[in-house]
Structures are given as C-alpha cells and as structure tokens.
UniProtKB/Swiss-Prot annotation:
This is Glycine cleavage system H protein. It comes from Marinobacter nauticus (strain ATCC 700491 / DSM 11845 / VT8) (Marinobacter aquaeolei). PROSITE patterns: BIOTINYL_LIPOYL (PS50968), LIPOYL (PS00189). It comes from the Bacteria. Binds 1 lipoyl cofactor covalently.
Length: 130
C-alpha cells in the first residue's frame, strides 16, 4: 500500500501539495505515482517566476519505462524549484513527500484548496486504480 500522509492535499493525477502558514505551497508526486513510474531518470519542473494553474500541466516525470505529466494542484507563481532533482531525480523514488518535492508556489487563492482531496479521499481514489 502506498504511503499517504494525512497533512497533505491531493489531486486525481497523483500530485500532492503542502501549504505553509505563509502561503507557500510545496508540490510533488505521490508515493503511488512514483511506484507506477518505476525508476525516475528525469524531472522537468516549471521555470522560476512562471505562473502555474491548478489542474494544469506544470512539469514531467520520466522513468525508464514511461513518462508522466505533472500537474499543479494549485495556482500561483513558482518561487523555488528543487534543483537537486536535476542531478538526482531518483530522490523522487526515495522520498516523494520529503526531499523529492518538485517546486514551490506562492499560492494565489487559498480557497482553491477546498476542491482538493484529503488523505482519505485520495486513498479511495488510489484503491480504485489498483
């Protein structure tokens, strides 16, 4: 069974978001997503200063067996990217909810979080796909 932390919000395309008190939203792919991909060999993230839109493509995760678009759960300006992933994309496999985060966004609208899944809803979504 995939790990699904309870302090995060999720979208159906298997990305997660953690929002800090200052409105910074950290985005990554879920444990389920990295398991489905297999060994990740490349992570593409949006450029610094770019605007990402909730539910829209913002990057890519490529593995030895497939490639998958990465969608942003929230809308906002990209304020940080995880540069470690450029040389060590396998961190996404090893620690998808920690050091394997992909990018950080200055959240444009906290109300957007209301439409995202909590851990229980995401667990049901994953169970339906397994």
């Amino acid at each position: 069974m995939s790990e699904i932390p309870s302090d995060l919000k999720y979208i159906e395309t298997h990305q997660w978001v953690r929002v800090d008190a200052d409105g910074t939203a950290t985005v990554g792919i879920t444990d389920f997503a990295q398991e489905q991909l297999g060994d990740v060999v490349y992570i593409g993230v949006p450029e610094m200063g770019a605007t990402v839109n909730g539910g829209e493509e913002a990057g890519v995760a490529e593995s030895v067996k497939s490639a998958s678009d990465v969608f942003s759960p929230v809308t906002g300006e990209v304020i940080e990217i995880n540069e470690k992933l450029e040389d060590e994309p396998e961190i996404v496999n090893e620690d998808p909810y920690g050091d394997g985060w992909m990018f950080k966004v200055k959240l444009a609208d906290e109300g957007e979080l209301e439409g995202l899944m909590d851990a229980a809803a995401y667990a049901e979504h994953v169970a339906a796909e397994e």
